[in-house]
């Protein structure tokens, strides 16, 4: 995978995911999420529910348009990166609200509705890769993009060991042709423990592989982590009523679409840990063989 291919993949995943999120909010999906976000800033009473959806949808739709424009040097890299930071900071700051945590289980770090919010940590490292790559070392960009992958797998994976989360994923697992067999082998909690253990194990192994520069470990654990985020995309098609004619996808669909950001993070990690040296060597060979 070349640098250009990696850039195109990251751009495509960002563009598609934010376009879907923007359209769904614009069409009225998941209004409670918007109300909770704007309530944190005491702005929930200033706009109607439909106006909140329109405002948020347009704001999110602007990001993929600016990203594509910046790739063609029609918009400055600084402008699109700052806008991405602004768009993602708005939901991320709401993690300071106690409503994002399970109060009956002691609050932080037992995450509740914040599970969909922490995914926004994945976005800014992707824009730094696209537009500020020369400002960072390859090692820094690798860890910047690994960090959100590790965070979501360790954090949400860790929640799988709690009863509330085990019960929450039943609707996802039992309708999946790839995962429903777990309930034939394990209890609801046991299956959740297996899923959580898988997430935690391979997040740690990927970190170890990157730290030790062990390519076989990076490949094996990276593919395992990738499988987690690709598997969640199948829930779009296996969970009933995720798609609808009114808002494209529902709240669950929005939650799932965000996992495409982690696929992009993993693509960046793969490029710098597995492909960058090969790509550079190929370019140097081509230059040496070209007529002087």
Where are these regions (language model features)?
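Membrane-helix boundary elements
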Residues: 176-186
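Conformational-control "hinges and anchors"
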Residues: 203
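Extended, low-polarity transmembrane helix blocks
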Residues: 1-62, 68-166, 186-197, 208-292
